[in-house]
Amino acid sequence: MNTRCRSHVLKAWKCFSEGMNYYIASNEDQYGPWRVGAAYPFIFQPNISRTMSDKAIKFPTAPHAHFGYKIVKTFYTPYENAEQTPGFLRYPAELRSLQKMLEHWNKGLAAAEKAIECADEKKKDEARRLEALGHFIRNSTITVMNIKKWWQLNMAMQNSATAEEAEACLDKIEALAYAEIENAKDTIPLVEFDSRLGWEPSMEYVCDKWHLEWKIRQVTDGALREIAAYRKMLNLHKQD
């Protein structure tokens, strides 16, 4: 790479490295959104079915995968233990840390984009792969942050004192659902460009185009429909 391009690449890696200082991976994250990235499903937490069944869904993985779906927990909730702060207390701190990670990551992405612009033609693909890798991790970080906010809002909604208070939480939950759809869409071109992204040896592909489109369908046909149904339930209460 030429000297100008090299400086942008070094800046990108420096920002990514600094961002990793704020990386947090609790158990629910290691076995959830950090494991499958932007393909992680967003399950509306109130159980409004008449089946009384578990709301966790089986994450689709290849039948021959060594671990596959067995190490992906799709119903996001804190996994507590006696040696750590409870989830409802640590999530605000984790979100603050991840926000700092995101800020560093975005600076690194900006540098990676400049590297693409000034790279020699024969090196442009390498620069694009750097940007795609950083972009993929950035979108995964957004998913981790969004699912923590999703859990917080689902809990707050179900503990609301009034239907109006619950509906305000529901509005924010719905906005997160749409944001995650866009985040998944933004990730698709990255995994199409570099097929190494979204693959892990013990699970095979978990964040390729197919899984990202599956996640979009899950949020659209699952979470958003249940959100609409729950809104009707709140309106029934307000009519009393």
Regions found by a protein language model. Give the residues of each.
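Substrate-binding groove of N-acetylhexosamine-processing glycoside hydrolases
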Residues: 1-240
